């Protein structure tokens, strides 16, 4: 495909070469992955800048490069084109290279601070049960098709970079997926990764403080989320109980709403929460439906409402959707539970922000018959302002808090625990510090008796622990199972 065709309609300046040349190998934003007759996209990153690797890409065989600034030394024989933002151009070029795969499927894009993975899993489960075609998923658990992992590398944990994203979408299209559910992170929106996904429906779950180390302010964080509803989707499903809903409705007045407190197109009333799940009456279109989901907590009801609305927009009948949700399997790392031989209940959850931790603990405390023991930490090289508040939340709802490591990265784990401890000081909870996460979980389990609930929070279904430059295998639920099987 000609470089000029990949960029047609997008302004650019030719610094060297002929943009009519053919790119036949592929696209990459990594010089290490570039090959013969590839297009290399120079993207500035946190640790490295692609502009510094043009010669490496050229040596690997790349015939063209997109840049956002003029390098001092242009490689011989390489067509170099300057654009205002290489991320924006990369999204366009990647979509065209792979034949705009998003247009061939019903893409449901789910964004929000909390609930993305759960809502996506619910939609996947419902559509899988109600249709014969395999369902594609792109998100925190990695891409999958028909419930099986897709053997394609992803560049970021939640929403891949544009070339990887379009490659995965093309794989799902070629695998005959008709519906794709994808989690969309705020950074993906801010960096234009999803600009040419062509989402049929976008779902907004909620907004609360998180990722401020990336965005700087809540205003910038919110604006990143709002990008999805400013021309990147055809329809919207919005949480009416979140203050941001009003702004989304200004952008998309025809958006459908769901909620519990505010009037909404899909509203839950008479909510009953038990350890086994949540029951409610769904009010929609002048009719009342009995509903039940095997997920405890109000957050489970909100996630179910979002899934119902999205699946209804895909053309499925509400009664069929509700029946499918009743049979929802446990979502790995999302309020995933197991009972120990001692009679305690262990809950593994991804709660890693102030809002999500408080919701998880409020749910646990709501049906606890004995003690609540919380095991958690905070990520290193990430927003440090949430550490003390999360400590205060844990202390307010727990009888015992076991502080531990959660991807400390380059930071001193003890320094992170010091910051969390500041928030614990004003609470009545006992607390202990065990930086080794496995030992911390073991300690909590050893002290958990009949009726106690142990919440292991922060990592969810993650399969690694980041310590310094090392990526070590670690999975909370696997560790819990190993320790309780002794």
Which role fits each region the language model picked out?
Residues 1-15, 34-39, 49, 128, ...:
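ATP-dependent carboxylate-amine ligase
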Residues 6, 38, 57, 93, ...:
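Residue-level signal for inorganic ion chemistry
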Residues 9, 71-77, 174-175, 182, ...:
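Acidic, Mg2+-coordinating active-site environments of NTP-dependent enzymes
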Residues 1-92, 96, 243, 267, ...:
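N-terminal leader/targeting and accessory segments in enzymes
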Residues 72-74, 143-145, 188-190, 243-247, ...:
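Short, active-site-adjacent cap segments at secondary-structure transitions
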Residues 16-18, 67-69, 84, 139, ...:
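Short loop/edge segments at beta-strand edges and connector loops
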Residues 67-70, 184, 206, 240, ...:
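Short secondary-structure boundary segments
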Residues 89-240, 246-253, 368:
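Phosphate-binding loop of NTP-binding sites
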């Amino acid at each position: 495909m000609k470089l000029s065709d990949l960029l047609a309609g997008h302004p650019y300046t030719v610094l060297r070469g002929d943009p009519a040349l053919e790119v036949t190998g592929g696209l990459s934003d990594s010089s290490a992955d570039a090959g013969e007759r590839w297009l290399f996209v120079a993207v500035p990153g946190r640790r490295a800048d692609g502009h510094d690797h043009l010669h490496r890409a050229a040596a690997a065989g790349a015939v063209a490069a997109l840049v956002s600034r003029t390098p001092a030394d242009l490689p011989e024989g390489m067509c170099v084109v300057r654009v205002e933002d290489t991320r924006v151009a990369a999204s366009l070029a990647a979509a065209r290279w792979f034949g705009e795969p998003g247009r061939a499927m019903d893409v449901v894009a789910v964004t929000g601070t909390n609930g993305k993975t759960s809502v996506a899993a619910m939609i996947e489960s419902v559509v899988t049960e109600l249709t014969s075609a395999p369902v594609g998923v792109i998100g925190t658990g990695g891409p999958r098709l028909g419930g099986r992992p897709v053997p394609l590398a992803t560049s970021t944990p939640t929403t891949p970079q544009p070339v990887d994203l379009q490659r995965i979408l093309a794989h799902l299209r070629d695998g005959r997926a008709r519906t794709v559910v994808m989690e969309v992170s705020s950074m993906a929106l801010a960096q234009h990764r999803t600009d040419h996904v062509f989402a049929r429906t976008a779902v907004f779950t909620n907004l609360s403080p998180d990722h401020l180390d990336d965005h700087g302010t809540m205003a910038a964080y919110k604006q990143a989320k709002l990008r999805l509803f400013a021309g990147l989707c055809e329809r919207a499903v919005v949480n009416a109980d979140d203050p941001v809903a009003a702004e989304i409705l200004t952008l998309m007045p025809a958006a459908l709403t769901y909620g519990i407190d505010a009037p909404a197109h899909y509203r839950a009333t008479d909510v009953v929460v038990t350890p086994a799940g949540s029951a409610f009456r769904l009010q929609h279109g002048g009719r009342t439906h009995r509903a039940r989901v095997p997920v405890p907590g109000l957050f489970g009801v909100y996630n179910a409402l979002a899934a119902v609305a999205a699946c209804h927009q895909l053309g499925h009948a509400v009664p069929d959707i509700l029946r499918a949700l009743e049979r929802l399997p446990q979502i790995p790392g999302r309020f995933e539970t197991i009972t120990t031989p001692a009679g305690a209940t262990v809950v593994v959850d991804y709660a890693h922000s102030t809002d999500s931790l408080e919701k998880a603990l409020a749910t646990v405390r709501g049906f606890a018959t004995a003690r609540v023991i919380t095991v958690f930490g905070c990520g290193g090289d990430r927003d440090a302002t949430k550490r003390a508040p999360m400590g205060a939340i844990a202390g307010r709802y727990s009888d015992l808090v076991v502080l531990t490591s959660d991807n400390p990265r380059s930071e001193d784990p003890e320094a992170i625990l010091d910051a969390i401890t500041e928030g614990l000081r004003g609470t009545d909870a006992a607390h202990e510090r065990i930086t080794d996460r496995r030992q911390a979980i073991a300690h909590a389990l050893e002290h958990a008796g009949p009726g106690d609930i142990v919440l292991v929070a922060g990592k969810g279904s993650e399969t690694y622990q980041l310590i310094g430059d090392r990526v070590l295998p670690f999975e909370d639920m696997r560790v819990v199972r190993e320790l309780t099987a002794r």
